[in-house]
């Protein structure tokens, strides 16, 4: 695979791959690139190549019919003719059609074949499409790449995340050629090494929110539980005790009581994972021991949990702003005014309630502002503009501040009602009491980690210090035998 002398007299790689003795592909206007196939991806790829100054030759089973869908400057011909005109060929056909090129394998000797195909599902075949293509044409230089880019992105030009293309090949020089070609097409190539990485590259476009599944399930489960909890307390209890029908509260009021609890619980889960990781390292006295799989997965999903927390907080704000618009709220307001007049009360001002509501709303706005900052800095383009210290300060320090202010928001909302018997319906605590449990645990755990006796030990562990007991029993050696390459930084 590494040799290209089979094309005739020994030549350098650039002389063999490119026509007319061109060195490299820096002058794209003199390079001919072949595309096997005439589908949507082949059409978009051809347009992209032409815009970047390449000459394109299309190999098709029916060139007369296919030529109607390509620009007139494109040479549309049969497979055999196309393969003889270029040394860099995009194989833009499905896996089941690879064998159609079998009779032309003598024309593919020493040429670069770029496999851009994808499968219908993850791990559909025992080997990747690129490895299968390499087994069919062992004398060709197979490169996997451009399969993560859609035809739409190719035609309109790469933008943002669609600029990245993953490339792998067993031939280093062929891989470098395709990497340079990707740069000429204004993509950002990412070298993933040998062709064994092709299976992972082919699975990338087929994954559907892999890291989001767990957090979404957790969020839905929490929302369902707290919704039913509020429904039983605020709707079923009045009906069972006083035959009072409060079912009208379900669409807005019950939902709005559920949203903030889920939001603050998800935010607590974001930072609880880090506390458990720190406790794990303190317990074993080392940072070289891998976390349990469940904790490792939890740590990887913190961004998704935080964004879901921000989503529930934003929806909570929208619902809260709509509360005064409800017809039921207007009726309640009129009833209160009538009762006040009937009781001959001239002034219903309550200083304590005024201060409570003012502080409650103020803390809510501050927590939402900090959550917005956390959400914005999680955007890749924004986080890439920050150095590590800036990013960790926002996501860690300000994140804990946001959690603390959110906890104050809930505390002031509950005020003294946690100690009043009438709010314990069916002998269950109020919603805000449940909402405070997990944030309080996280804040208390963070305070414990700030203690000098613990923080100093944790810093030593992060710098590589280990307990001798772990080295003797777990590692079976001394510190010089520990390889830094084995460390997994979460």
UniProtKB/Swiss-Prot annotation:
GO terms for cellular component: cytosol; early endosome; endosome; endosome membrane; Golgi membrane; plasma membrane; trans-Golgi network transport vesicle. Its cofactor is FAD; heme b. Its main location: membrane. NADP(+) binds at residues 38-41, 60-61, 93-100, 118, 151. FAD binds at residues 152, 160, 281, 302, 378, 395. It is a multi-pass membrane protein. One of its GO terms (molecular function) is cupric reductase (NADH) activity. The chain crosses the membrane at residues 208-228, 259-279, 305-325, 359-379, 393-413, 432-452. It comes from the Eukaryota. Keywords: Cell membrane, Copper, Electron transport, Endosome, FAD, Flavoprotein, Heme, Ion transport, Iron, Iron transport, Membrane, Metal-binding, NAD, NADP, Oxidoreductase, Phosphoprotein, Transmembrane, Transmembrane helix, Transport. Pfam families: F420_oxidored, Ferric_reduct. Fe(3+) binds at residues 229, 319. Belongs to the STEAP family. This is Metalloreductase STEAP2. The lineage of its organism: Eukaryota, Metazoa, Chordata, Craniata, Vertebrata.
């Amino acid at each position: 695979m590494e040799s290209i002398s089979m094309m005739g007299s020994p030549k350098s790689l650039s002389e063999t791959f490119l026509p007319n003795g061109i060195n490299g592909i820096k002058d794209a206007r003199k390079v001919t690139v072949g595309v096997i196939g005439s589908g949507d991806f082949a059409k978009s790829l051809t347009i992209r190549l032409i815009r970047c100054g390449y000459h394109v030759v299309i190999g098709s089973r029916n060139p007369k019919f296919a030529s109607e869908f390509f620009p007139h400057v494109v040479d549309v011909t049969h497979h055999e003719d196309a393969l003889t005109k270029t040394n860099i060929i995009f194989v833009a056909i499905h896996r089941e059609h690879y064998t159609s090129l079998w009779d032309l394998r003598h024309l593919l000797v020493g040429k670069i074949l770029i496999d851009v195909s994808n499968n219908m599902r993850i791990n559909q075949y025992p080997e990747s499409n690129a490895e299968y293509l390499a087994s069919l044409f062992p004398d060709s230089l197979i490169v996997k790449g451009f399969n993560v880019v859609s035809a739409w992105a190719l035609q309109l030009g790469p933008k943002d995340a669609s600029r990245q293309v993953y490339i792998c090949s067993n031939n280093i020089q062929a891989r470098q050629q395709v990497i340079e070609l990707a740069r000429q097409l204004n993509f950002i190539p990412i070298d993933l090494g040998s062709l064994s990485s092709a299976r992972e590259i082919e699975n990338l476009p087929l994954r559907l929110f892999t890291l989001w599944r767990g957090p979404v399930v957790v969020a839905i489960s929490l929302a369902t539980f707290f919704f039913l909890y509020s429904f039983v307390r605020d709707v079923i209890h009045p009906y069972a005790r006083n035959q009072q029908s409060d079912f009208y509260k379900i669409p807005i009021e019950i939902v709005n009581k559920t949203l903030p609890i889920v939001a603050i619980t998800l935010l607590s889960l974001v930072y609880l994972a880090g506390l458990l990781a720190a406790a794990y390292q303190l317990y074993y006295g080392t940072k070289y021991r891998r976390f349990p799989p469940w904790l490792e997965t939890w740590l990887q999903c913190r961004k998704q949990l935080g964004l879901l927390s921000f989503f529930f907080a934003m929806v909570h704000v929208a619902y809260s702003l709509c509360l005064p618009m409800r017809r039921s709220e207007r009726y309640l307001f009129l009833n209160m005014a009538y009762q006040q007049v009937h009781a001959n009360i001239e002034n219903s001002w309550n200083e304590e309630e005024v201060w409570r509501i003012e502080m409650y709303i103020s803390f809510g706005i501050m927590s939402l502002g900090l959550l917005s900052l956390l959400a914005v800095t999680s955007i890749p383009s924004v986080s890439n503009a920050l150095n590590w210290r800036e990013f960790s300060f926002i996501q860690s320090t300000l994140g804990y501040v946001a959690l603390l202010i959110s906890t104050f928001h809930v505390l002031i909302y509950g005020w003294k009602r946690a100690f009043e018997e009438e709010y314990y319906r069916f002998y269950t605590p109020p919603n805000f009491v449940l909402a405070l449990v997990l944030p309080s645990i996280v804040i208390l755990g963070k305070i414990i980690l700030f203690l000098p006796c613990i923080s100093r030990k944790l810093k030593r562990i992060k710098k590589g210090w280990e307990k001798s007991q772990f080295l003797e029993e777990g590692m079976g050696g001394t510190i010089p035998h520990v390889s830094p390459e084995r460390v997994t930084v979460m």
